[in-house]
Amino acid sequence: MEKKLSSENNQLSSENILGLLPHRYPFALVDKVIENIPGERAVAVKNVTINEPQFQGHFPERPLMPGVLIVESMAQVGGIIVTQMQNLPKGLFVFAGINNVKFRKPVVPGDQLIISCDLLSIKRQRFGKVKGEAHVDGKLVCSGELMFSLVD
């Protein structure tokens, strides 16, 4: 599948994202990219809806988006940055670690996560690190550093 950007502000549609990332329902956690500087930075949207499967058990009486899924959403935005880097080998980059992750506010159905990631480093064309932040209504809800590794 060819990787095409929409013409407006280098945005990526959900179809573009599916062409870049291997994730599929129910684990595709990025709805669209609203700012995209390939290999450097991406800002994306994740709309949190009550019909997502995790809310059946987390928690039925008071649904909260699990923190691990917020972090995974940030990792997927980081993956969008890495997969567009022309000088890296093609292959599957996987989540390899997290540092300094903090959860500051709960995320609930109806919220819209605005996730920004900035590339911090690439080493030996196999390992990457991004800084990620997730905001709801302009308030920081999660932040941290995420590491990626190319698997053979």
Curated annotation (Swiss-Prot):
Its EC number is 4.2.1.59. It is an enzyme of class 4 (lyase). Gene3D superfamilies: Hotdog Thioesterase. One of its GO terms (cellular component) is membrane. GO terms for biological process: fatty acid biosynthetic process; lipid A biosynthetic process. It is found in: Cytoplasm. InterPro entries: FabA_FabZ (IPR013114), FabZ (IPR010084), HotDog_dom_sf (IPR029069). It catalyses: a (3R)-hydroxyacyl-[ACP] = a (2E)-enoyl-[ACP] + H2O. CDD domains: FabZ. Its main location: cytoplasm. The keyword Magnesium does not apply. One of its GO terms (molecular function) is (3R)-hydroxyacyl-[acyl-carrier-protein] dehydratase activity. Signal peptide: none annotated. The active site is at H58. Keywords: Cytoplasm, Lipid A biosynthesis, Lipid biosynthesis, Lipid metabolism, Lyase. HAMAP family: FabZ (MF_00406). NCBIfam families: fabZ (TIGR01750), PRK00006.1 (NF000582). Involved in unsaturated fatty acids biosynthesis. Catalyzes the dehydration of short chain beta-hydroxyacyl-ACPs and long chain saturated and unsaturated beta-hydroxyacyl-ACPs. Belongs to the thioester dehydratase family. FabZ subfamily. This is 3-hydroxyacyl-[acyl-carrier-protein] dehydratase FabZ. It comes from Prochlorococcus marinus (strain AS9601).
